[in-house]
Amino acid sequence: FTLIGFRILVKITFQNLNQGNKISFRESIAIIGVNPHNISLVETLTSSQSNFNLVCFIDTNKGLNGKKVAGINVLAYNKKPIVAYLRWKGIKNIVLTKGYLPEEVEENLIEDCINNDIKVYKPELLENNNTRNKETLKTYNLEELLFRETIEIKNPKVIEQFRNKTILVTGGAGSIGSELAKQLGSFEPKELIILDQAETPLYEIEMYFKKNIPSCTCHFELVDVTNLEEFETVFNKYRPEIIFHAAAYKHVPLLEKNFKQAIKVNIFGTKICLDLALKYGVNKFVYVSTDKAVNPTNIMGASKRFAEMLGQTAYNCKKNVHKMQIMSTRFGNVLGSNGSVVNLFQEQILAGGPITVTHPEVNRFFMTIPEACKLVIEAAAMGAGGQTYLFDMGRSIKIVDLAEKMIRLAGKIPNKDIKIVFTGLRPGEKLFEEVLTASAETLPTYHPKIVIAKEENPCVDTMEEIMVYLQRLNHLERKEVIEQLKLIVPGFVPYE
């Protein structure tokens, strides 16, 4: 979980109940489900060091109703909401093992608990070198409470595609790039080149590899992808076989003002990387895109869609004599990335509020960083070239609901302890994001969370004309850039 880069603030956070400070009162707690893990918690929760008063087990087995397990009463519940019983008994804490209850029941229970200021804990095995292992408690993190299913790469063919290969990750010190590098580093590549223009984050990822994956042969290159001469030295030196191109600028309002940087990095940086990959015979090129590339209303989204189209054009061009497999992966917001709304809300809660939300109806798709990167790697392994892969991101989440949930997780009451203030949509922002245009269709893959978008190939002549025009970037006004992007980017309707 530390790879995700953030923790939810909670009023009382602890990992080992035996290390908790003694307090003058004990909060009541109930355990949901009678199973070996939960039964082993009884000793911890009833010890003299515990901060809790264990009231009961609550179980779906009606045969256990009124009986005792490990000296603790068991309540069997029926259709009546569990929270109603918890409120009646004044129980402010529960222990819940994810997956114990049917998914819908579990979701409703967690939602009800959050709305009623009842804290939800999960059992966790505490390893102790001096004594026998013991069960203890840990709070759920936000990803778990958003009901994101954990994804594991279990297909050995996926790992085999990257083993003993020379892999380049651009933007390798960023939120997505660094996680891609960490996951790929565990696949035993021949060499892993992590490239970024940000010095401090690149140093931090270097320290991570030295400490956690010392067996991986890594190289850390401080290079700007828009500098052709410097970038080419990396290709000439290492001869990468696989490229994950994650280098990009992503913040919508900032790039509306700094539109030339969006074009320079997101479009020309991608073009340079593609040209070098073609020149040096790279086998596979994976472009990391965004759902903001679909029907964009801002320059950032339009630049990312243009970059996707550059990949499609390069795949079909005559220069692709080595049949380099070029593909794009498209997904939504990631939890805990640099500058994400979750990090912002966390800071605002810590400061006592208010939490700022742009609009009461704005909603977004969310994924965890590890989840997104695992799907990128899986798509990269299955891709034969020319595809745009879309990920199943579950249901979209209203940002105001996310804000309220985080406030309650912090033990506060929304709009009482911490205010929520609506500030208005920023330039280029939409109420909702899409992963597919209305006219496009999808094709399934062997992975249930990955589909292929069926989209028309861009007009090569128009692409080349626009690239020539954009070469004059330093002399272009924002309006001129927008007019050029509108000629080629499907569905681009600037917010003005």
Could you say what each language-model-derived stretch is?
Residues L222-I242:
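Conserved Rossmann-fold cofactor-binding substructure of NAD(P)-dependent oxidoreductases
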Residues K79, E103-T166, L278:
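Flexible, Lys/Arg-rich cytosolic regulatory linkers and terminal tails that connect or flank
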Residues K157, T313, C317-E496:
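Strand-loop microenvironment adjacent to phosphate/nucleotide-handling motifs in alpha/beta enzyme folds
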Residues I167-G185:
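N-terminal Rossmann NAD(P)H-binding glycine-rich loop of SDR-like oxidoreductase domains
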